Amino acid sequence: MENKKIIYFLCTGNSCRSQMAEAWGKEYLGDKWNVLSAGIEAHGVNPNAVKAMKEVDIDITDQTSDIIDRDILDKADLVVTLCGHANDVCPTTPPHVKRVHWGFDDPAGQEWSVFQRVRDEIGARIKKFAETGE
């Protein structure tokens, strides 16, 4: 964790979107960032999120579903909310913490193609961030 920035992906249940974002973040940003995720609540990692990431050869079976940790939130360099609910109810962040919102549809309970689409959209967005810093 030495001298790496912290990026913290947040969504409602830390089950689907933020789990996939954490995995893509580790894939594209892991050399420069400590990549973490959490939720307003912890619903457990959705098995379809695991399956969707496995399709692109990324294993998230060891990731855990966690509630937002105030210490991590306060130390993060960048907080990214991935759904409107998390954006609205996320605890206030200190002025030095940059906070952005990248909205994605919630794939939970949707057909398989929605999981694949959201997975790919999140991956493309994080890849763009890795390449451009925005």
UniProtKB/Swiss-Prot annotation:
Supply one GO CC term from the record.
cytoplasm
Q: Which compartments is it annotated to reside in?
A: Cytoplasm
- Predominant location category: cytoplasm
Question: What cystine pairs are annotated?
Answer: 11-83, 83-90
Per its record, what are the GO molecular function terms? arsenate reductase (thioredoxin) activity; protein tyrosine phosphatase activity
One Pfam family this sequence matches: LMWPc
- Give its E.C. classification number: 1.20.4.4
Oxidoreductase listed as a keyword: yes
Its recorded reaction(s) are: arsenate + [thioredoxin]-dithiol + H(+) = arsenite + [thioredoxin]-disulfide + H2O
Query: What positions constitute the catalytic site?
Result: 11, 83, 90
Q: Name one GO biological process term.
A: response to arsenic-containing substance
Q: Which InterPro entries match?
A: Arsenate_reductase_ArsC, Ptyr_pPase, Ptyr_pPase_sf
Keywords attached to this Swiss-Prot or TrEMBL record, sorted alphabetically, are:
Arsenical resistance, Cytoplasm, Disulfide bond, Oxidoreductase, Redox-active center
Q: Family per UniProt?
A: Belongs to the low molecular weight phosphotyrosine protein phosphatase family. Thioredoxin-coupled ArsC subfamily.
Q: What does this protein do?
A: Catalyzes the reduction of arsenate [As(V)] to arsenite [As(III)].
Protein name per UniProt: Arsenate reductase
Organism this protein belongs to: Bacillus cytotoxicus (strain DSM 22905 / CIP 110041 / 391-98 / NVH 391-98)
Q: Which gene encodes it?
A: arsC
